């Protein structure tokens, strides 16, 4: 079963980030045999990196051998619904993530895969405690 690649790792590779590229590339290379997938939300988040050119995003994902498009399912919606409810409860207590809705949707999507590859594990762990998460 494939691992879902978070947007941050894709950006590291797309912009050849001097700080994060090497570790992000090693992590993706190490999980290539399991398969790699991307959430539709991450594809949307990549738009500014590729000047709004969806074909450029698709070519980039193809070069990385990352499965796209993946379908958003009812199970994804149910997981996102529950996680958003948790997020709002945390917000009312004063502890919130930076980009809550994107992280909720990406984490929910990753629940039906092997896990999530990200360098922002703290953004996901409280909302998705059973989600396997690997960092570079």
Predicted regions and their residues:
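Generic detector of contiguous secondary-structure segments
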Residues: 56-76
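Short active-site oxyanion
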Residues: 1, 32-36, 46, 65-68, ...
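Acidic, PIN/NYN-like endoribonuclease modules and their adjacent C-terminal/linker elements
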Residues: 2, 107-136
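Nucleotide phosphate-binding site architecture
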Residues: 10-11, 44-47, 125, 134
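Short, hinge-like loop/turn segments at secondary-structure boundaries
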Residues: 54-57, 87-88, 133-136
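Active-site neighborhoods of divalent-metal-dependent phosphate/nucleic-acid chemistry enzymes
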Residues: 69-115
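Short, well-structured N-terminal submotif of metal-dependent ribonuclease cores
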Residues: 1-38, 48-61
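Conserved glycosyltransferase catalytic-site signature
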Residues: 7, 40-43, 100-104, 121
């Amino acid at each position: 079963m494939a691992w879902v690649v978070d947007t941050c790792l894709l950006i590291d590779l797309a912009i050849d980030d001097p700080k994060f590229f090497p570790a992000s590339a090693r992590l993706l290379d190490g999980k290539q045999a399991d398969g790699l997938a991307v959430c539709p939300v991450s594809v949307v988040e990549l738009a500014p990196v590729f000047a709004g050119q969806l074909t450029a995003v698709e070519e980039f994902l193809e070069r990385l051998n990352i499965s796209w498009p993946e379908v958003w399912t009812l199970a994804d919606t149910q997981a996102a619904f529950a996680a958003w409810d948790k997020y709002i409860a945390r917000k009312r207590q004063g502890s919130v993530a930076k980009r809550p809705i994107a992280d909720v949707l990406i984490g929910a999507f990753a629940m039906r895969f092997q896990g999530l590859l990200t360098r922002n594990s703290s953004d996901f762990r409280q909302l998705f405690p059973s989600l396997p998460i690997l960092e570079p």
